[in-house]
Amino acid sequence: MLDNNIIIKGNRDGLNAVINMNNFRDFDDMLESLMEKLSKGRLFYKGCTLKIITELKYINEREFRRLKDVLFDEFLIKDCIFEDSEEKVNKPFSGIYEGKTKFIRRTVRSGQVIRYPGNLVILGDVNSGSEIYAGGNVIVLGSLRGYVHAGVRGNRKAVVAAYFMQPQMLQVGDVATRAPEDNVKPQYPEIAKVRGDTIVVEPYLPNKFI
């Protein structure tokens, strides 16, 4: 019998995993099935870009974190993209400070979670173990070492900028990645944005983005 609960197929940039959440009891049931399916070709997925297409409304923030951790740690996925199968349309931001912006004048410490529907500007560091969620852009006037998700409603036009960019995990819109495990640490501000289906990090040139 053909299993249509999870379908994995190749695309031009990597692999698609089409998941029908309605066919699973809950998130744990789906995750177990996905891991079983991916385990059959574990070495094949190493270093690839995986796009997960499903009904995103059935997965909460903690479950997204668990799913991404499994894909990055267990299967060594390079990049992970989430696409809503219901194809909701989102309005993009066109500038780094467009829309509502909240300023946080302190360091965000491990265990702290900050959420804001607009842009976030943090006048301090974002420590490892902390979490930042913004509907728009995230600007860190310090070191970024925690988890950050800009454009949480699928806004791929959002950006993340920091004086020192070394996040545990970085997500813009529906595209997620991790910082490279090397010793190269640029001594200048950087900005992360989505290009195609990949997050790219470039030197931050204020006149270009503001």
Swiss-Prot record:
Keywords associated with the record: Cell cycle, Cell division, Septation
Gene Ontology biological process terms, A to Z: cell morphogenesis; division septum assembly; regulation of cell septum assembly
Native organism: Clostridium tetani (strain Massachusetts / E88)
Family stated for the protein in its record: Belongs to the MinC family.
NCBIfam families registered for this protein in UniProt: minC, PRK00513.1-6
Function summary: Cell division inhibitor that blocks the formation of polar Z ring septums. Rapidly oscillates between the poles of the cell to destabilize FtsZ filaments that have formed before they mature into polar Z rings. Prevents FtsZ polymerization.
Family matches, as Pfam families: MinC_C, MinC_N_1
Quaternary structure annotation from Swiss-Prot or TrEMBL: Interacts with MinD and FtsZ.
Name of the featured protein: Probable septum site-determining protein MinC
Coiled-coil features, chain-numbered ranges: none
